[in-house]
Each structure stands twice: as structure tokens, then as C-alpha cells.
Swiss-Prot record:
Record key words, sorted: Cell inner membrane, Cell membrane, Membrane, Transmembrane, Transmembrane helix
Protein name, per record: UPF0060 membrane protein Bpet0062
Spans through the membrane: 7-27, 33-53, 63-83, 86-106
Localization, UniProt: Cell inner membrane
SUPFAM superfamilies in the cross-refs: Multidrug resistance efflux transporter EmrE
Species for this entry: Bordetella petrii (strain ATCC BAA-461 / DSM 12804 / CCUG 43448)
Amino acid sequence: MPLLHTLGLFALTAVAEIVGCYLPYLWLKQGHSAWLLVPAALSLAVFAWLLTLHPTASGRVYAAYGGVYVSMALLWLWAVDGVRPATTDWAGVGLCLAGMALIMAGPRHG
């Protein structure tokens, strides 16, 4: 699978997971309608389905996906919650993405 396709799929997967977790947060912590649980459940189902589209071992997918998830979570924090990430947050994202690149580019045994 081409790298840009994989990264795009990871980004979509992260958004689906974040939305699926953010909507119940709005209900539980911010007093929004319990009806938000319906789109949250659908979003988490899409998240699980998207994970199946990756062509490598699931453990490796989850590990590599984690780097993109951390990046998307910080972007969500900034865009949706209006909290600007600190320099150390971005440094952490860089470390996560470096780890993701190492996992994705590393040799495959068996």
C-alpha cells in the first residue's frame, strides 16, 4: 500500500476514533444530549472497520497508527477545543511519528 494512502487511512481512522470518544465526553461532561451516543457508536464502528483495511499484522498497524492518532488528537485539541498545543506537545508528536516511521519501514520477519 503506498505511503500516502496508508497515512490518509491512518488519519481517517484517527478521526473516527476521536469523534467516537469525543461525543460521549460531550454527553457525560458537558451536559449534551444522550443521543450523541448513536453517532459515537457509528463512528467507533467505522473506526474498527477502517483498521481492517490495513494490509499488515494488526499489532503493527495499531503501533504505527498510534503516531498518527497522537498527531490528530493534538490537531483536534487545537481546532475543536481551541487549545493551542505547546512546543513540547509538538516535540512529542515528532517522537511518535519517528517511532511510527521506524515501525512501518522496519524489516519484516516471518
